Regions:
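A short SAM/SAH-binding and catalytic strip from SAM-dependent methyltransferases
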Residues: 144-158
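A short acidic, Gly/Pro-enriched loop at the edge of an enzyme's catalytic core
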Residues: 134-146
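Conserved class I S-adenosyl-L-methionine
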Residues: 18-71, 85, 89, 109, 174-189, ...
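Class I SAM-dependent methyltransferase SAM/SAH-binding core
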Residues: 75-79, 83-133
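N-terminal amphipathic/basic-hydrophobic helices that include classical n-h-c signal peptides
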Residues: 1-24
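A short glycine-rich, Lys/Arg-flanked "PGG" loop and its adjoining helix->strand segment in the class I
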Residues: 159-174
């Protein structure tokens, strides 16, 4: 029971942070959004930990992984990587990853948390709403795959992201993303 109470408390904290992040409204600009994520980065890192939350572990991660089918030959772009826990999951499967987030603080936390995978994961700060920023992640080879877990719905303008992913992926590359279904959105107004 104690674990359940702790989990419920954490869910309340998570909901409060999410409300703060999402509660600004649809007209929230990238800089305003970035500021809120910077302020909440440590909370999210603590809440997601090394293995993410239960919903992600039990529902999202298995399906995304099934669709992505990571293997040691893969060179994967992890979009809006947060604290890097999915990047490390991919690294454990032998893949090489370039992971980015627009929160500098979140990337610092990811580098610290996932330091044992430093040879396989390159963490970068980049803005998913800025095509040029994303294209700067291009290295000496094209990505075999791209992935985004539960982030697309929080990106204010996805067209630059989609254009950049298209350019960065090899011709046979795939882009797998998970997003929140509208029926799970909490109405705040």
């Amino acid at each position: 029971i104690r674990d359940r109470v702790t989990m419920e408390y954490r869910k309340e904290d998570l909901m409060e942070a999410k409300k703060q992040i999402l509660g600004v409204g649809e007209n929230m600009g990238t800089e305003e959004s970035k500021k809120i994520w910077e302020e909440n980065a440590q909370f999210w890192d603590n809440a997601m930990g090394d293995k993410s939350n239960e919903f992600h572990r039990e529902v999202v991660r298995p399906k995304v992984t099934e669709l992505l089918s990571p293997n040691p030959a893969d060179y994967i772009l992890d979009i809006a990587c947060g604290n890097g826990n999915y990047s490390s999951y991919l690294a454990q499967r032998g893949a090489s990853i370039v992971a980015f987030d627009y929160s500098k603080k979140m990337i610092e936390l990811a580098k610290r948390r996932q330091s044992q995978y430093a040879k396989q994961i390159e963490f970068c700060v980049a803005d998913a709403t800025d095509r040029k920023s994303i294209l700067e992640l291009k290295r000496n080879r094209a990505f075999t795959k791209a992935v985004s877990n539960m982030a697309i719905m929080d990106i204010t303008d996805i067209e630059p992201l989609l254009m950049a992913v298209y350019e960065l992926l090899q011709e046979s590359g795939i882009f797998v993303f998970a997003t929140q279904h509208p029926c799970f959105v909490t109405l705040t107004e």
